[in-house]
């Protein structure tokens, strides 16, 4: 690819930014030399690794790669039998510490997550912790080996300390001698050539026997090693030699261990430097909120909300650019400082960044094409040495572009063919654009020439664009508007700035009528565009509000459905429980009947328990009724159309009947239920199909019991021939069944006789809470041998 364009589009500045996020020196160099590539699959792979690293950064912060060192040279020396020094060993230790840290980060960042493109790299890291720990144990710094690096070194250094103490004691003894002290310049011990000496006055040289190792610059002081410590210094020197030999053994042993792990170290360095590079790209993307664009080889560009990465993100106005699909050339017109050049550079720079595997500062679903070459003629690139004019400089560059451009090229021109006669310049510009159009090159060009606007309007595959300008504020908005040619606004701006209107009108009269009409047409189109855009914003606002209300309604309906299902479920559970309790009560009643019928307990006890059971049954009946009302409310819709004779279920009574009259204005109508005709409201009815029983559809098993009861319970009971206890037990159960079956009244035949049975029956009726009133039968009803009881 043409490398000259890197500087023109400021791609090199992006690489400098990228290198600032790298930790390793080798990675920094790699960042600064990063170039765009043209292989689609490799580009997608690079974008994927950057995206996965960015995802990890957002999810689990980052990890430091500081401490990575290139160990290739050290490992190569080990191959030829050399040993490593402390600096090299500490760098290897540093590399292993980074490996351990990064390995842990890779594991924690992906806990409970699926594998990504970086998982293999993290898995390939081998920290070799034992080697790292051994190096840290033995080497304290580049200049210091630990005493306990080996037992022998510990022993030698202990001897050195002992010898030092002996020498210092001997020299101190000499200095404390009053005679010797007069020969010394200072009462201090010094070291020369690795041997302990005393500073002796030059004139007292013969008074202190020993070996002279040095003298001061003035010659007034001689540094003499007294004979009393010569042998001790010799022994100390031997100990230092032994110490160095032992240190070399320790370093050699560590070097051997490094050599044993050379393959792992090579792999760790390669992986860590690769991850350092990938995370540098991710951190760069994070700094400008970058995204991975979609790539194609069809020349289609669709940058959504693109921003120039070198401009202040808080101030830059995002642009939308579509190019290469419906049209292959985009001609941008408009006033200076309106953002035309920035738009050109943004498209070119984002293309280079994307093909280099870098995320671009744009919105999701942005699309970039892969180009074999990117050409740009932007700015004043004339050479003083070449003595070229502005026009000649640009034309020289354009000639080179025309020689190399093809259908896999992106060509960018700023003020194409400016700097010469406008008529000739416009003609040249159109011809150059036409040639590039024939090549199939994707082209963007900025211009002030009105002729190029006409060229774009009259040529297939060429589109106009402009950078919006606010005439009221005399400032550009920096928005790129595709499909609309730009207007110079010279007259409007001059008028706003106070230029005499007569001068402006005179200037207009000097313009060709066709040109003036064309400019007026552009102004009209721009006004219409702004109106349409404003209306579109309002429509979008309404649509957003409608979507919001729709979502709220759907959520409300969902809550209602869930509540309805919950009510039905709880109702069924409660109904089942009530029926179970009722069954147990019935069983207990039967057991008590058998028990008391056999005379095993007093009558008062039986009546007491019967009364308690009846109260419980009444309570269960009320609960079941409430549940059925709630169930009906949750599941019921009133019938829309009723005809006389339709089968219906009266929810409040849980009885099946037929429509006897049509509903009135209030929705009230008469329903015939057996011998009972009742006035009900239409909202209390459910229209039944002939093939669906009301019990099955609306009442569950409880409704089945009630319906069967209403069909089987007689309105009369005959107690003649029964003992008092038997009669009362039968009557008590009969009254419960009749009440449950919704009978309004019953006829109790007890006979006249002695009146004892009648008296017992009346006593039971008096105690029964469901009985509203009772009386002996009148003439024709059975007279005193019958009692008529009416339910509440």
Swiss-Prot record:
Gene3D superfamilies in the cross-refs: 3.30.1370.110, P-loop containing nucleotide triphosphate hydrolases
EC number: 3.1.-.-, 3.6.4.-
Keywords: ATP-binding, DNA-binding, Endonuclease, Hydrolase, Nuclease, Nucleotide-binding, RNA-binding, rRNA-binding
Pfam families, A to Z: MSSS (PF20297), MutS_V (PF00488), Smr (PF01713)
Listed GO MF terms: ATP binding; ATP hydrolysis activity; ATP-dependent DNA damage sensor activity; endonuclease activity; mismatched DNA binding; ribosomal large subunit binding; rRNA binding
Smr domain ranges (all copies): 717-792
InterPro entries assigned to the protein according to its UniProt record, in alphabetical order: DNA_mismatch_repair_MutS_C, DNA_mismatch_repair_MutS_core, DNA_mismatch_repair_MutS_sf, MSSS, MutS, MutS2, P-loop_NTPase, Smr_dom
GO biological process per UniProt: mismatch repair; negative regulation of DNA recombination; rescue of stalled ribosome
Residue positions binding ATP: 334-341
Enzyme superclass (EC): hydrolase
Recorded superkingdom: Bacteria
Family the entry assigns: Belongs to the DNA mismatch repair MutS family. MutS2 subfamily.
NCBIfam families noted in UniProt: mutS2
UniProt subunit comment: Homodimer. Binds to stalled ribosomes, contacting rRNA.
PANTHER family from the UniProt entry: OS10G0509000 PROTEIN, OS10G0509000 PROTEIN-RELATED
Purpose: Endonuclease that is involved in the suppression of homologous recombination and thus may have a key role in the control of bacterial genetic diversity. Acts as a ribosome collision sensor, splitting the ribosome into its 2 subunits. Detects stalled/collided 70S ribosomes which it binds and splits by an ATP-hydrolysis driven conformational change. Acts upstream of the ribosome quality control system (RQC), a ribosome-associated complex that mediates the extraction of incompletely synthesized nascent chains from stalled ribosomes and their subsequent degradation. Probably generates substrates for RQC.
The protein's name in its UniProt record: Endonuclease MutS2
Naturally occurring in which organism (per UniProt): Agathobacter rectalis (strain ATCC 33656 / DSM 3377 / JCM 17463 / KCTC 5835 / VPI 0990)
Lineage: Bacteria, Bacillati, Bacillota, Clostridia, Lachnospirales
Gene: mutS2
């Amino acid at each position: 690819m043409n490398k000259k364009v890197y500087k023109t589009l400021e791609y090199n500045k992006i690489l400098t930014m990228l290198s600032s996020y790298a930790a390793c020196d080798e990675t920094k160099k790699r960042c600064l030399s990063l170039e765009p590539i043209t292989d689609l699959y490799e580009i997608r792979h690079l974008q994927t690794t950057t995206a996965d690293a960015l995802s990890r950064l957002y999810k689990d912060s980052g990890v430091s790669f500081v401490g990575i060192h290139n160990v290739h040279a050290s490992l190569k020396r080990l191959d030829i039998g050399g040993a490593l020094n402390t600096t090299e060993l500490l760098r290897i230790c540093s590399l292993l510490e980074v490996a351990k840290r990064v390995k842990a980060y890779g594991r924690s960042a992906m806990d409970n997550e699926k594998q990504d493109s970086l998982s293999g790299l993290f898995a390939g890291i081998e920290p070799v912790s034992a080697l790292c720990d051994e190096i840290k144990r033995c080497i304290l710094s580049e200049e210091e080996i630990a005493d306990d690096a080996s037992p022998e070194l510990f022993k030698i250094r202990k001897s050195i300390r002992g010898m030092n103490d002996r020498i210092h004691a001997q020299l101190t003894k000499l200095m404390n001698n009053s005679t010797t002290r007069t020969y010394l310049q200072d009462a201090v011990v010094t070291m020369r050539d690795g041997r302990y000496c005393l500073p002796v006055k030059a004139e007292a040289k013969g008074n202190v026997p020993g070996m002279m190792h040095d003298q001061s610059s003035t010659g007034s002081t001689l540094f003499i090693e007294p004979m009393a410590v010569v042998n001790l210094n010799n022994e100390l020197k031997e100990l230092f030699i032994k110490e160095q030999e032992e240190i070399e053994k320790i370093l050699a042993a560590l070097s051997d261990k490094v050599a044993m792990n050379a393959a792992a170290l090579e792999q760790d360095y390669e992986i860590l430097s690769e991850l350092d590079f990938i995370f540098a790209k991710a951190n760069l993307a994070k700094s400008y909120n970058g995204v991975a664009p979609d790539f194609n080889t069809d020349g289609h560009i669709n940058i959504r909300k693109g921003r120039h990465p070198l401009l202040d993100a808080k101030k830059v106005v995002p642009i939308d650019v579509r190019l290469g699909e419906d049209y292959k050339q985009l001609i941008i017109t408009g006033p200076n400082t309106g953002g035309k050049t920035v738009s050109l550079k943004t498209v070119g720079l984002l293309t280079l960044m994307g093909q280099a595997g870098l995320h671009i500062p744009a919105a999701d679903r942005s699309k970039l094409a892969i180009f074999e070459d990117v050409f740009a003629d932007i700015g004043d690139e004339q050479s003083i040495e070449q003595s070229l004019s502005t026009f000649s400089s640009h034309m020289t560059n354009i000639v080179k572009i025309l020689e190399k451009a093809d259908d896999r090229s992106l060509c960018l021109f700023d003020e194409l063919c400016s700097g010469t006669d406008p008529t000739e310049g416009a003609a040249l510009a159109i011809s150059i654009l036409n040639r590039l159009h024939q090549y199939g090159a994707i082209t963007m060009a900025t211009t002030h020439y009105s002729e190029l606007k006409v060229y774009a309007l009259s040529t297939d595959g060429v589109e106009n664009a402009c950078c919006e300008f606010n005439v009221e504020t005399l400032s550009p908005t920096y928005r790129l508007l595709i499909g609309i040619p730009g207007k110079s606004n010279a007259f409007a701006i001059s008028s706003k700035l106070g230029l005499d209107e007569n001068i402006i009108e005179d200037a207009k009269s000097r313009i060709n009528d066709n040109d003036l009409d064309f400019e007026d047409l552009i102004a009209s189109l721009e006004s219409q565009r702004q109106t349409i855009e404003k209306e579109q914003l309002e429509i979008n606002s309404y649509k957003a509000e409608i979507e919001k209300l729709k979502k709220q309604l759907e959520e409300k309906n969902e809550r209602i459905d869930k509540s309805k299902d919950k009510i039905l479920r709880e109702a069924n559970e409660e109904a089942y429980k009530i029926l179970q309790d009722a069954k147990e009560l019935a069983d207990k009643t039967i057991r008590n009947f058998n028990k008391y019928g056999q005379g095993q307990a007093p009558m008062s006890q039986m009546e007491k328990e019967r009364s308690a059971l009846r109260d419980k049954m009444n309570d269960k009946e009320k609960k079941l009724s409430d549940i059925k009302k709630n169930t009906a409310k949750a599941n019921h819709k009133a019938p829309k159309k009723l005809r006389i004779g339709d089968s219906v279920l009266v929810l409040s009574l849980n009885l099946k009947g037929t429509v006897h009259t049509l509903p009135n204005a209030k929705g009230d109508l008469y329903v015939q239920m057996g011998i009972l005709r009742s006035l009900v409201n239409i909202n209390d009815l459910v229209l039944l199909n002939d093939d669906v029983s009301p019990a099955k559809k609306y009442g569950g098993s409880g409704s089945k019991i009630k319906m069967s009861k209403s069909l089987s319970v007689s309105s009369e009971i005959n107690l003649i021939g029964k003992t008092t206890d038997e009669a009362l037990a039968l009557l008590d159960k009969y009254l419960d069944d009749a009440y449950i079956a919704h009978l309004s009244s019953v006829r109790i035949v007890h006979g006249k006789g002695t009146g004892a049975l009648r008296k017992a029956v009346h006593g039971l009726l008096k105690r029964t809470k469901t009985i509203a009133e009772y009386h002996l039968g009148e003439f024709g009803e059975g007279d005193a041998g019958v009692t008529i009881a009416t339910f509440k």
